[in-house]
């Protein structure tokens, strides 16, 4: 006796198989590029101070230069737009961090400092240009899946409209994180980083759902440090040599080591992360700039 195909005896098996195939196909077809929100423009400036030349100045001239620099930096500091840090180690002596609404305003901040006499004693060592960025992996996967299930083609008019609606809702909800003031914490740790794009390990070729899963795991580590450290992530693809910049603000520095060490063990950091130089500094309030310069 010839046995009937399982799909005829159990038609639900055929349905389940086709459903699984559809789910797999849907996953493969999800748009690969996650949505991001951008906020303030950010510039880090690292300088070496020319102490031998500075010491050759008279005390009155030093005081004059210190007062001029403080006058230029005090207003943006009070607004949470600029901050000065005394760097540890040989990578530099001072680091200035600027948060502004645009690159034009960042350039104006640079030029304003360049026009002061203090600039004659600041030797540029490094800089980093970026914008505050919030990655929307969770929202992206949810939205892209819904659109794919409805058969909405990526980049179509309907697709773009729904994406923009989602972006606008998130933009309003995330506004405080997109447009923050520079935290007044005593310590700052800054470093740039990439996601690997090598032949063996390439972050950008992973399915978006897998990237979303790994980033969620990564974020859970950071959330355990809430209240101990404040993190601001900036995007720099197309702006600087690395893909992201990371600023960590805290009242004591050991938390930087503990947080970054723990993150080394999550999958996305262990397999796909590459890091640049680390800069650690102590907040130098503008009213104490003269003290830092040794001006009595």
Task: Kindly give the residue locations of the regions a language model identified.
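Short, glycine- and small/hydrophobic-rich beta-strand elements in well-ordered beta-sheets
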Residues: 73-92, 119-134, 218-243, 259, ...
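C-terminal structured interaction module
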Residues: 247-296
